[in-house]
Amino acid sequence: MHYIIDGYNVINSNDMFIASTLEGRRNKLIEFISVNRPHGSLRNSVTVVFDCKSKNPYESDGYNKSHYGSIEIIFSDGVVSADDIIAEIADNAKNPYEIIIVTNDKGIRRRTAPSGAKHESVEIFLSKGFKPKNAERASEAASIGVKEEINEEFEKLWLKKRSEK
């Protein structure tokens, strides 16, 4: 499955993405997806699409794509909207029935329905991130980070003691 997420629709639909800056809100969404995996299996891909009000003159033609781990992040180019990009992905998919569009925007739902893509509400998508299995994964991810920090600290201590000999 390929989840296409209407980024601003999601962050404006839930208080857990409140931050002092828009960038902070976007980062909270990306981190939530990365850690809690509401999209399920690692085999499921995720693309988060955000609108960009004005074209950055330093970017190449077209919209801006980047990645955070396995999450693809797309910013529109100021000419084409995020809605247009979401519709383009759904319309051009080889297997549109494997696409799930996460949004509460009825306009996007109507526009992409003919492609055969499925739709999921923001609330359902986010709730899947809080299932016990996903909470376990998030805890494991956090504990792996802590283990790595501890190992690095022990390595520093060990190297320091060896250099003192």
What are these regions (language model features)?
Residues 2-5, 9-165:
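Nuclease catalytic cores that cleave nucleic-acid phosphodiester bonds
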